[in-house]
């Protein structure tokens, strides 16, 4: 590579490590634990925790490899990296039937892999005595896969609003599917029709939401996320702007769902979309009617899943550095005037919904970052 003029620097890196985890909420998860009670001078033992003598550590194996590079006399630099983290013997408190006499049992339920690529680029587009223009861009592509589950789980495990299946993401939603409204404006949900052997033979609609079938309805994880920006310095002026983005993935808009109630909760506010609800004069609507007796109108379903794509303007800065000849008489070596704005704007699927949250269902009480505008002076003596 010494004879390759356009390569300034090329560095290969690789790392591997393993880490254990025993965080399952009990220091003695391998032991049955009892409480002793004394009532009317009679002693009794009651099972307070069901242990698992076969439980072991959860172990994560992390592997990273990639390149750092600098090309064309420093005009293009960056990093390309592949990462993989395989977690084996995953810890989980498996819920049990009430007839077992205990609520759950700790166990190692399988293995999971997180892997992806990261790209970070920095470019020097123009550099003269009076003008410098730089750009940067980064992205991360990330995929989660459940490799295997304990044989006792028969290939899948349900936990709340999620379903864990071998070969699929652990962030897969497991919700009822909304089927619009019936002829009276009552919310409907899909339900599988099964034969005597339990095989699915068809599908029907039902207004009894708790008995509707739940389905895998989308992955929370985005396909790609990252940021980009640019900076420009010319004739004493400096300008910079940075963006963040996310593509792919879905989130549950809990705030919107709560504002689309059918009137069962007195004193609760409504979203303006409730004006489009079904009425005798608006039978083409797919929004349930307003009725204090319709408790399943905004039931947990894919109706309130929304794309988590977004583009945000994170910051904008504009400044001007006065010529030295102007400030030299004040015994100042440098004076810069600037204004900046942070959290400028967010563009997403639904107004009022901020997808910049953790990979869980959206909460109704999450506040977006506050927009801030400031200005100032920078002095050097």
Describe the function of each predicted region.
Residues 1-168, 235, 300, 305-381:
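Extracellular/periplasmic, surface-exposed regions of secreted and cell-surface proteins
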Residues 66, 210-213, 225-227:
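Short, hydrophobic/aromatic alpha-helical segments in well-folded domains
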Residues 87-88, 197-199, 248-250, 355-357:
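A short local loop/turn or secondary-structure capping micro-motif enriched for an aromatic residue
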Residues 97-101, 158-163, 175, 212-213, ...:
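Surface-exposed, low-complexity loop segments enriched in small/polar and acidic residues
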Residues 107, 124-220, 260:
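Conserved small-residue
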Residues 110-112, 166-172, 266-273:
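Short, surface-exposed secondary-structure junctions/capping segments
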Residues 219-253:
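Glycine-rich, aromatic-lined ligand/substrate-binding cores of catalytic
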Residues 246-337:
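Extracytoplasmic gating/loop element in the C-terminal half of outer-membrane beta-barrel translocons
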């Amino acid at each position: 590579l010494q004879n390759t003029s356009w390569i300034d620097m090329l560095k290969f890196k690789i790392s591997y490590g393993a880490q254990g985890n025993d965080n399952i909420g009990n220091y003695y998860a391998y032991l049955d634990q009892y409480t002793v009670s004394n009532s009317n001078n009679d002693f009794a033992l009651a099972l307070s925790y069901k242990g698992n003598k076969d439980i072991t550590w959860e172990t994560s194996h992390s592997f990273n490899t990639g390149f750092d590079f600098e090309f064309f006399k420093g005009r293009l630099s960056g990093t390309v990296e592949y990462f993989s983290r395989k977690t084996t013997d995953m810890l989980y408190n498996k819920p049990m039937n009430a007839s077992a006499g205990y609520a759950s049992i700790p166990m190692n339920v399988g293995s999971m892999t997180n892997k992806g690529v990261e790209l970070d680029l920095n470019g020097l587009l123009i550099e003269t005595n009076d003008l410098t223009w730089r750009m940067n861009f980064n992205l991360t592509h990330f995929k989660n896969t459940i490799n295997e589950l304990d044989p006792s789980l028969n290939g899948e495990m349900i936990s709340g609003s999620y379903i864990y299946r071998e070969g699929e993401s652990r962030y897969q939603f497991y919700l009822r599917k909304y089927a619009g409204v019936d002829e009276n404006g009552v919310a409907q949900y899909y339900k599988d029709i099964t034969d005597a052997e339990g095989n699915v033979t068809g599908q029907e609609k039902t207004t009894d939401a708790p008995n509707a079938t739940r389905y895998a309805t989308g992955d929370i994880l985005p396909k790609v996320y990252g940021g980009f920006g640019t900076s420009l310095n010319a004739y004493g002026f400096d300008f910079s702007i940075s963006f963040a983005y996310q593509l792919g993935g879905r989130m549950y808009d809990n705030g919107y769902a709560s504002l689309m109630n059918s009137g069962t909760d007195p004193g609760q506010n409504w979203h303006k979309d409730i004006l489009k609800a079904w009425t005798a004069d608006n039978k083409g609507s797919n929004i349930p009617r307003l009725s204090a007796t319709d408790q399943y109108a905004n039931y947990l379903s894919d109706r309130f899943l929304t794309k988590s794509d977004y583009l945000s303007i994170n910051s904008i800065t504009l400044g001007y550095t006065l010529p030295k000849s102007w400030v030299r008489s004040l015994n100042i070596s440098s004076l810069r005037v600037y204004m900046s704005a942070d959290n400028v704007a967010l563009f997403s699927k639904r107004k009022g919904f901020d997808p910049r949250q953790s990979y869980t269902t959206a909460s109704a009480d999450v506040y977006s970052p506050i927009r801030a505008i400031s200005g100032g002076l920078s002095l050097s003596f």
